[in-house]
Curated annotation (Swiss-Prot):
One of its GO terms (biological process) is glutamyl-tRNA aminoacylation. Its main location: cytoplasm. Belongs to the class-I aminoacyl-tRNA synthetase family. Glutamate--tRNA ligase type 1 subfamily. Pfam families: Anticodon_2, tRNA-synt_1c. Its cofactor is Zn(2+). This is Glutamate--tRNA ligase. The gene is gltX. One of its GO terms (molecular function) is tRNA binding. ATP binds at residue 251.
């Protein structure tokens, strides 16, 4: 059959991979890892990456799911050279190939009713036979062409299908185990397994990276490709991702959607780094830049074993990237979280200033955004436990002394603020804790925060002094 590419295929491209999600839900972490492996293998081999949306399930596919998949891919920065292509826009092409297959005797119309097929299955089960179509319609000519029918692929009945899976090694399946697959439904729509074959053929896909749940589809697809005279791609079926309890990853293990991880405050660099390690590695190395992944990744090195998703490990990686990426890059992502939590970050220090200060305690950008409120918003409430411990009447004197000395500062620096705290403790003959803890609670409303000299510097002089005075007034009201 004549190859009809969708785009000008570069004959020098030795590797062309694809990611082909179905838009029936969000982009989950398993799909994201498959996309990543496929993308990395293409980049490692100076190849091309194709994005295809397999939306033949008209009842379950939604525009919202398509948008979510595209958003997830863009957030992960997995750019594609070709696409996105939609199967629903290619029905004419699929049916053209099916009609040619019928003409060439590679496929045939099947007019069997549901009742006949159910009776056939029941009879085969009673006789301990594997349920399969008996080719009753293969040589039938009594039905009019326009009578309701499906189209079946005429699968070979002898021999075996053998392929060398890049992850799992040699896989061999007898053709006697395979049925005559329906490739076009009664309503005229082509079926998933057939669309995939034509797409991979038309798009010049050389390597198919996908989940192990597709292994059973592979021999059927290979037989169709052979019938069409099309090249057979290399297949790589990666294992599932389990939760840390060994069960298949699901919502009960926490977030499973890529964009949920964005919402929870994870950086795309952290999630990408974590996903690549779920089944692949390079020695004991844990941290990989994108450039290192591209240079080192090999699909043949991916493990056959299922991987366990460990949220604590992801959090560790995320904190690493928050602290090690250029602060301006992290700030760009943090802006989204600040807006989501209603924090006007234009009214205070630059985000690039607070990130190094808060990242020692925060593992996610969500935590960082929430922890930053006191830099931008007035303190309206105090932590109750901290109040009981640090806002006793004797805290008034060090707070008042602090306010007096801080007001006199002409140069609002970390060093000068620290010196004021030390002088206050010395003059009142008290420990630094008796100064620092009430000071912290007054300025942040919290019992814990970064060092108070740095915190006060970022909060600003006027706000700091105002909050100290508010705290003194609060202590008076509590002890009337």
């Amino acid at each position: 059959m004549k190859l009809e590419p969708l785009f000008n295929l570069d004959p020098n491209t030795k590797v062309r991979t694809r990611f082909a999600p179905s838009p029936t839900g969000y982009l989950h972490v398993g799909g994201a890892r498959t996309a990543l492996y496929s993308w990395l293998y293409a980049k490692h081999n100076q190849g091309e990456f194709v994005l295809r949306i397999e939306d033949t399930d008209l009842e379950r596919s939604t525009p919202e799911a398509t948008a979510a998949i595209l958003e997830g891919m863009e957030w992960l920065n997995l750019a594609w050279e070709h696409g996105p292509y939609f199967q629903t826009k290619r029905f004419e092409r699929y049916n053209q190939v099916i009609d040619q297959m019928i003409e060439q005797g590679l496929a045939y119309r099947c007019y069997c009713t549901k009742e006949r097929l159910e009776d056939l299955r029941h009879s085969q089960e009673q006789n301990k036979q594997k349920p399969r179509y008996d080719r009753y319609c293969l040589h039938q000519s009594e039905y009019p062409v326009d009578a309701p029918h499906v189209v079946r692929f005429k699968n070979p009945t002898e021999g075996t299908v053998v392929f060398d899976d890049a992850v799992r090694g040699r896989i061999e399946i007898s053709n006697r185990e395979l049925d005559d697959l329906i490739i076009r439904r009664t309503d005229g729509s082509p079926t998933y397994n057939f669309c995939v074959v034509v797409d991979d053929w038309d798009m010049g896909i050389t390597h198919v990276v996908r989940g192990e749940d597709h292994i059973n589809n592979t021999p059927r697809q290979i037989n169709i490709l052979k019938a069409l005279g099309a090249p057979i791609p290399t297949y790589a079926h990666v294992s599932m991702i389990n939760g840390d309890d060994g069960q298949k990853l699901s919502k009960r293990h926490g977030a499973v959607s890529v964009m949920q991880y964005r919402d929870e405050g994870y950086l795309p660099e952290a999630l990408i780094n974590y996903l690549v390690r779920l089944g692949w590695g390079h020695g004991d190395q844990e941290i990989f830049s994108r450039e290192e992944m591209i240079a080192l990744f090999d699909i043949h090195s991916v493990s056959k074993s299922a991987s366990a998703f460990n949220t604590e490990k992801l959090q560790w990686l995320n904190q690493h990237y928050i602290r090690s990426l250029p602060v301006e890059q992290v700030a760009t992502h943090l802006e989204w979280h600040m807006k989501k939590h209603g924090i006007d970050y234009s009214n205070g220090p630059n985000l690039a200033e607070i990130i190094p200060v808060l990242s020692e305690r925060c593992k996610t950008l969500k935590e960082l955004a929430i922890s930053s409120r006191y830099f931008y918003q007035d303190v309206e409430n105090y932590d109750e436990k901290a109040v009981a411990k640090n806002f006793k009447p004797e805290a008034i004197k060090p707070l008042a002394k602090l306010a007096e000395k801080l007001t006199a500062l002409s140069d609002w620096t970390v060093e000068n603020i620290h010196e004021v705290m030390s002088q206050t403790a010395q003059e009142l003959d008290i420990g630094m804790g008796k100064v620092g803890m009430p000071f912290r609670l007054a300025v942040t409303g919290l019992g814990q925060s970064p060092s108070m000299d740095i915190t006060a510097k970022l909060v600003g002089k006027d706000r700091t002094i105002s909050r100290i005075n508010n705290a003194i007034a609060f202590i008076h009201t509590q002890n009337v």
